[in-house]
């Protein structure tokens, strides 16, 4: 291997190792991968339950149980999490909300929400701005590390609760 190639490989590997992963658990911070493939928009959102409920253990009080049940109910409609332009004429196809807490499983200190959603959009070209209304209801949620992928375009951004929108 030439010296230049070895040096390039070493730099690439050091940069790769220095970049934090999207899977890290940090209170108040979540991650979102958005993918537009033709007329189908899919998303995968991960957020610490502490940022959504104020706790990340199995509920200990009636109020905590009610809060967790209300979150589960709210997540049945993806518009609780993400707001799409009306002009895109999107129809929700699927949502899936998973957490050890929802299943009554005692975690090992940290608990996350893993949320997947899918829309079919009649006018996907109108998907020019996304809002994140969940920030209003969950003040412990501070930011989302977002990755956007569509045909011929990729973008990464940080969406903050102070400016809860993203334009690809």
Model-identified regions with their sequence ranges:
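N-terminal secretory signal peptides that target proteins for export/translocation
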Residues: 1-5
